[in-house]
Regions:
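Conserved pre-motif I regulatory segment
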Residues: 2-57
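Conserved helix-turn-beta segment of the N-terminal RecA-like "Helicase ATP-binding" lobe
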Residues: 90-115, 295-304, 377-383
Length: 839
């Protein structure tokens, strides 16, 4: 007779709660068992499942998506409430749903689906869908009933947070009626804060950034509200306005020629009650070093964030050989690596034009369209975010060749043959106004360096997706080479990535100074799975363990506390909390920035004390807001002995000769002609160039809001007043630029009595515009002169690196300064030329 299956197992109807058991019971599970690391993570989460915030850290490709889906299903089975799985974008959300289908787990993409509302299916959607001012989940004050959630799983949390920050950042675009109103309202304040930056904004220089002083911003809130509120429903404003309107007085307001950007110090995440009040919040992250952003942006419990859930071993990472060609041999320039990448894509391992190995997919990550242009002669495809999904699908389907991806360093899944060679050609630079201003304020600080290393590690993780995967990673450019060579920067990498970098350095040591053939051989060992390389790679990771505790910076915790106090009107308490934050950091640049924020809170209750505090902030960080009373330029004294000053600076900066050469090359590479977006980096590079050569150098325009881009003290009696126009694309020096240079000379003479000024213009042309008049005695550094200077400075570094610490030896430095014609007294006679009248 037929079996009555309804009676089989009828005595046990309780839903399974342990994620491992849920997986084991799936009828169509793709693998018999979960990977060991996944099982460990799921068991440890289950033990802590009642914690409101849980961070799960695994190496890239460690199976976090499957773990997150099983955790969501477990919470549904337990009856805690509805489950939402958040991906950074729609492309990744579709990938997650496909993974769930493969597992046999019920999901939906529709928040109104009854299966989600009744707790039968996991809602898979984007962070943007939940976090926006018109959220279907409800926004505080919108009159709608917020959706109660049992669990929110945030996949690729650090990438998702970029979306969250964007939703709490309101940009009033140039051309919008409110933009002109805001500029008119604060024009006088902006000009007082930085006359040059304000003039640049009005001249449509999109690199110019100037902050509206917080005391002016707070004093005119009624006018600001009158300018913005009528446009609350406009495109570009309506999704952000409801989230920040209540904290508008606390926002930093930053002006560029492209818009006015309003951004709160921390995200008022309580505006999204579905997330803020969710019973459980799980953050899936890679092994990035700093989790402070989970506290500042999402108000996660810092004590819980500091207790991440991890596997027992960090050896679940795929095999990567990470090489920086320029660190192996200075002659291996970027163009040589581009040719090599093309040959690898074609299977031409030995570079003789005839394929001798299987062709592979080579993926190149670049930060901008401009950077992608250099790859155009070699690329089979160039993808931007809008067409990335189709591009990734094509790579997964088979051999494509060399594929360039523009400004996508996270959230891209390139398993197996989809990517066997990954090239990082630069890292994304700050694009929004607040980030650009913060990057300038924190320039050279350990905090900014840690952020850059985090982005580099994110990029390097794209090419391996599980422990059986393998990939060669090539790092282009000196700045990326420094990241893997400099011990301080390597220490900022996660343990597993650091171990792979250390192993790859052993390979690099074997082929140091050799040419492309040796590099090809090393790459082949990884691609061909040479048993000796594979064994060494696995051995390097075998003993690596995840960190027992997560990194949450103390100042991040107190900054969050201060913001929450300020948002409820307790400004004095907020200022007191920020005082604790400033005592918890050693980096003076960050302390200055924190003091600036403390002054902003204090200004609500004691404006005079706020101005005094801002003066203290300026002593720690010369690039914070200048007090309302202004700043008197500091005395500028030339180095008594140029060679001694240079040797002391180089000794402080560089631990070994390779670091010196790479560091100098990275510095020189920051000067890019014809790219306005790189102007600020060029100005910073010129200042650091002076320090490398033993010349006292500053950036008055950044320090005081007026004066030249660079000021070099060639001697106590003579200054070089330097204006940089590297971003110009004109064939002559404009009258306005000449007038600016003349004004900077007058500023120098006024502020430093008895000094003679040498006017210097860094410009793509030495030809004066017909309407312009040269500043008396001026010199012009043209691209040709710059190339000669680069060659001399590079030779200076190479000569000092060739020996046992010669860069620390004053006599050796003096000799090389003389050989390179880099002495302060004659520097601009050699590496600049006189201006020419237009024909």
């Amino acid at each position: 007779m037929p079996l009555d299956w309804s009676r089989v197992g009828a005595g046990n109807k309780d839903p399974l709660l342990r994620p491992r058991e849920i997986y084991a019971a799936l009828p169509n599970r793709p693998w018999p068992y979960l990977r060991h690391e996944q099982g460990e993570v799921l068991e440890r989460w289950f033990e802590r499942r009642t914690d409101r915030d849980v961070v799960i850290k695994q190496n890239t490709g460690g199976g976090k998506t499957v773990a997150g889906l099983l955790i969501a299903r477990s919470t549904l089975n337990e009856g805690v409430g509805k489950a939402v799985y958040l991906a950074p974008d729609t492309y990744l959300a579709r990938q997650v749903r496909a993974e769930a289908d493969r597992l046999g787990l019920a999901t939906t993409g529709d928040p109104d689906d009854l299966a989600f509302r009744s707790g039968q299916a996991i809602l898979v959607t984007t962070f943007h869908k939940l976090i926006n001012g018109k959220s279907v989940f409800g926004v505080t004050g919108d009159g709608r009933q917020a959706i109660d959630l049992g669990i929110v799983v945030v996949d690729d949390a650090h990438a998702a947070l970029a979306t969250a920050e964007g939703q709490f950042r309101l940009t009033v675009a140039a051309g919008h009626p409110a933009y002109a109103k805001l500029l008119a309202l604060f024009a006088t304040d902006l000009e007082q804060q930085s006359p040059k930056a304000w003039a640049d904004v009005r001249a449509q220089d999109f690199t110019a950034v100037v902050r509206i002083p917080f005391w002016s911003w707070q004093a005119r809130q009624s006018e600001v509200m009158a300018a913005l509120h009528p446009h609350a429903g406009d495109d570009g404003i309506k999704f952000e306005w409801p989230l920040i309107a209540d904290v508008l007085p606390l926002c930093a307001a930053t002006v560029t020629s492209r818009g006015v950007e309003l951004r709160p110090p921390c995200l008022p995440i309580a505006m999204i009650p579905a997330f803020d009040k969710a019973a459980r919040r799980v953050y899936l992250t890679a092994t990035l070093a700093d989790d402070s952003i989970l506290v500042t942006d999402l108000d996660a419990d810092p004590k819980l964030v500091q207790r991440p859930v991890t596997p027992g071993s960090a050896s679940d990472l795929g095999d990567r050989m990470i090489l920086a060609p320029v660190a192996l041999n200075r002659s291996l320039d970027d163009e040589a690596v581009r040719v090599l990448a093309r040959q690898l894509a074609d299977g031409d391992r030995d570079g003789d034009g005839v394929p001798d190995a299987p062709p592979v997919n080579v993926v190149v990550l670049v930060p901008s369209t401009r950077a992608a242009a250099a790859w155009a002669p070699y690329a089979d495809r160039v993808h931007h975010v809008r067409d990335l999904e189709a591009g990734v699908a094509e790579l997964k389907a088979g051999h494509v060749g060399l594929v360039v991806m523009v400004n996508k360093y996270d959230g891209v899944d390139l398993p197996g043959d989809a990517c066997r060679v990954l090239v990082l050609d630069g890292v994304p630079r700050p694009m929004d106004a607040t980030e650009r201003r913060e990057a300038a304020v924190l320039s050279g600080s350990p905090t900014l360096l840690a952020r850059q290393i985090q982005r580099i590690e994110q990029g390097m993780g794209r090419g391996v997706r599980d422990s059986e995967d393998h990939c060669v990673v090539l790092l282009l450019g000196s700045d990326l080479a420094v990241a893997t060579h400099d011990q301080r920067q390597r220490a900022l990498l996660s343990p597993a990535t650091r171990a792979q970098v250390e192993l790859s350095r052993d390979i690099a040591d074997l082929i140091q100074g050799e040419g492309l053939d040796s590099l090809r051989s090393a790459i082949g060992a990884c691609l061909d799975r040479d048993p000796q390389w594979v064994a060494a790679s696995r051995r390097a990771l075998a003993e690596i363990r995840y960190a027992d505790s997560g990194v949450v910076r103390p100042e991040a915790v107190t900054s969050r506390q201060a913001f929450d106090l300020a948002a409820t009107g307790r400004q004095r308490d907020a200022a007191d909390a920020m005082q604790r934050a400033t005592t918890e950091v050693e980096d003076p640049a960050v302390r200055g920035l924190l003091l600036e924020q403390r002054a902003a809170y204090l200004n609500h209750v004691d404006p005079a004390a706020a101005q005094r505090m801002l003066t203290r902030a300026l002593e720690l960080n010369q690039f914070v807001l200048r007090p309302a009373a202004g700043v008197v330029p500091a005395q500028l004294r030339a180095a008594a002995v140029q060679a001694k000053a240079a040797a002391e600076f180089l000794d402080q900066e560089y631990a070994d000769g390779v670091s010196l050469v790479l560091g100098v090359k990275a510095l020189l590479d920051e000067v890019v002609w014809g790219d306005e977006e790189r102007s600020d980096e060029a100005e910073a590079a010129w200042m650091r160039l002076g320090l490398h050569l033993g010349v006292t150098s500053t950036r008055p325009e950044k320090l005081y809001g007026t004066g030249p881009d660079n000021l070099w003290a060639l001697s106590d009696e003579r200054h070089a007043v330097i204006e940089l126009k590297t971003g110009c694309t004109t064939g002559s020096i404009a009258k306005s630029d000449l007038d600016q240079l003349g004004g900077s000379v007058r500023w120098d003479v006024t502020n430093y009595s008895g000094v003679k000024s040498l006017a210097v213009m860094v410009h793509p042309s030495a030809v004066l515009h017909g309407l312009g008049t040269a500043v008396e005695g001026m010199r012009v550094v043209t691209p040709q002169k710059w190339e000669a200077l680069k060659k001399a400075v590079t030779a200076f570094a190479v000569a000092l690196a060739d020996g046992n610490g010669r860069w620390r030896d004053e006599q050796a430095v003096a000799e090389q300064l003389a050989v390179g014609k880099l002495l302060a007294g004659s520097f601009f006679q050699t590496y600049a030329e006189a201006p020419k009248q237009a024909a």
